[in-house]
Amino acid sequence: MFFNSLLTNFAALEVGQHLYWQIGNIRLHGQVFLTSWILLGALLVFISLGTKKMENDPKGLQNLLEFLWDYIRDLARTQIGEKVYRDWMPFIGTLFLFVFVSNWGGALIPWRLIKLPSGELGAPTADINTTIALALLVSLSYFYAGLSNKGWRYFEYYVHPTPIMLPFKILEDFTKPLSLSFRLFGNILADELVVGVLVFLVPLILPIPVMFLGLFTSAIQALIFATLAAYYIGEAVEEHH
């Protein structure tokens, strides 16, 4: 009885206040969709402005976008390999940009000034549902990469170099999305909570360096997420001898 009660209490725990949307029997965190749509819209506008008038000598936004393109290309080539990295560049780039914009949007935009009927806005990546969805998407992607490149030979990976590795490789398929999701969620949520507490206690000077540290951490977390996603895909398409 004690353990059942304890587990029930943990399941009922919530961090922050939420705006819920009820669709049939499904209850969604509405604030996550709102902030995601706002940030994705801003990202699309940013990319549209940067690619509106392409020039041979890039300047301004075009220069920044080309830098990001080259960076993502090098990351994908390094982690996935020369053979198929081009096929996965759009996916890795989209992951990186979404996580990066979500993290920085949570750190820079004063979402709490926007009043809702209930709940409060915040970084999409500070919600565990978002990070789990992203992590599961990565898992499905590397399964697809392995099967599309190797067919049924992909499953040889689970018994390479010895069949003893089978249970460990299966367990690894569960731990990969868990580590991806909880690492990103924990870091971004912790940053939001620390900044929120400091703004409440010392509202003038102290939160500023912490916010800059949060921006740096947010960028690093986006890079780690995209790099690990590319690495897992590269691992799936790699030929084992």
Swiss-Prot record:
Pfam families in alphabetical order: ATP-synt_A
Recorded GO MF terms: proton-transporting ATP synthase activity, rotational mechanism
Taxonomy, superkingdom: Bacteria
Lipid bilayer topology: Multi-pass membrane protein
Intracellular or extracellular location(s): Cellular thylakoid membrane
Entry's transmembrane regions: 30-50, 91-111, 128-148, 193-213, 214-234
Disulfide links within the chain: none
GO cellular component terms, A-Z: plasma membrane-derived thylakoid membrane; proton-transporting ATP synthase complex
Keyword terms of this UniProt record: ATP synthesis, CF(0), Hydrogen ion transport, Ion transport, Membrane, Thylakoid, Transmembrane, Transmembrane helix, Transport
Reported function: Key component of the proton channel; it plays a direct role in the translocation of protons across the membrane.
Subunit structure: F-type ATPases have 2 components, CF(1) - the catalytic core - and CF(0) - the membrane proton channel. CF(1) has five subunits: alpha(3), beta(3), gamma(1), delta(1), epsilon(1). CF(0) has four main subunits: a, b, b' and c.
NCBIfam families the UniProt entry points to: ATP_synt_6_or_A
HAMAP family: ATP_synth_a_bact
Protein name as catalogued: ATP synthase subunit a
Organism annotation: Prochlorococcus marinus (strain MIT 9301)
Gene name of this polypeptide: atpB
